[in-house]
Amino acid sequence: GASREKQALMRKFGESIGMAFQIQDDILDYTRTARTGKPSNNDLREHKVTLPLLTVLESVGEERRRELQARLARCHEEDESVEYLQHIVENEGGMEKAARVMQEYLARAMSVLSEYEPSEYRDALANLCVYVGERDR
């Protein structure tokens, strides 16, 4: 068994890589179907406020936030609302802001790995970090 310190480091790695993976998944949900092979904007259609939209909601005033939340509530019935919110997220920098947060989580995961001696296992986990940051599906 690993020491408590090593266990805590691996927990931090797992949480960080998991958050990065989820944020990348949220970003990919805004991309076109041809790129991912699955329908886009499912999160909007399911009224899920993921990080790309959340960063936009946090950056606008109260009146604008209420308007965007009302649009989100209509996403299951109106493609126009889905397209509108996608446009807002893209043009207000929501995906870029989310990508920066994802990179911060990946940096945390990589910093954990620096606490370990070089090995094929550490290299495999580092490669996983690269994959999560670059995946497009």
Regions found by a protein language model. Name each.
Residues G1-R137:
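All-alpha prenyltransferase/terpene-synthase fold signal
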